[in-house]
From Swiss-Prot:
One of the GO BP terms on file: translation
Function: One of the primary rRNA binding proteins, it binds directly to 16S rRNA where it nucleates assembly of the head domain of the 30S subunit. Is located at the subunit interface close to the decoding center, probably blocks exit of the E-site tRNA.
Subunit (UniProt): Part of the 30S ribosomal subunit. Contacts proteins S9 and S11.
Keyword Ribonucleoprotein: yes
Cellular component terms (Gene Ontology): small ribosomal subunit
Keywords: Ribonucleoprotein, Ribosomal protein, RNA-binding, rRNA-binding, tRNA-binding
The protein's name in its UniProt record: Small ribosomal subunit protein uS7
Gene3D superfamilies: Ribosomal protein S7 domain
GO molecular function: rRNA binding; structural constituent of ribosome; tRNA binding
Family matches, as NCBIfam families: rpsG_bact (TIGR01029)
């Protein structure tokens, strides 16, 4: 962490198809090895597949809804107190909530067994909308950890 100055947050331009900053951020999360056009094709293909499957006119609002389902409210952070390390539950700030949700969705989709990444992502988005899937499992696991360590909440930073 820099001691001198706070680094300015980069402005993310909205994506070309939907004009949404959220979708643009998610494309960046899906992107690997700098292949943005491939990531765009994957995300747009997944949103197209989901909107056809569920008869949705606005895939962006559906995506926002899915993100809201996956966003964690609390997480645990390690804190050393007198030689012991405690897992202290803390509230997650809004920007990190979104980033974690996007990361979990992308990782969960990559681990699925469908043929193409677009189909995997579509399946994961579908499952997350229904409250299932690995991304939701990850969120529930984080919430469970925070709940189990509620006794240490007075050690907050």
């Amino acid at each position: 962490m820099p001691r001198r100055r706070v680094v300015a947050t980069r402005e993310i331009l909205p994506d070309p198809k939907f004009g949404s900053q959220t979708v643009a951020k998610f494309i960046n999360h899906v992107m690997s090895h700098g292949k943005k056009s491939t990531a765009e094709r994957i995300v747009y293909g997944a949103l197209e597949t989901v909107s056809q499957k569920r008869n949705i006119e606005d895939p962006v609002s559906f995506f926002e809804e899915v993100l809201e389902n996956v966003r964690p409210m609390v997480e645990v952070k390690a804190r050393r107190v007198g030689g012991a390390t405690y897992q202290v539950p803390m509230e997650v700030r809004p920007s990190r909530r979104t980033a974690l949700a996007m990361r979990w969705l992308a990782e969960a989709a990559a681990k699925r067994s469908e043929k193409s990444m677009a189909l995997r992502l579509a399946g994961e988005l579908n499952d997350a909308a229904d409250g299932k899937g690995n991304a939701m499992k990850k969120r529930d696991e984080v919430h469970r950890m925070a709940d189990a360590n509620k006794a240490f909440s007075h050690y907050r930073f």
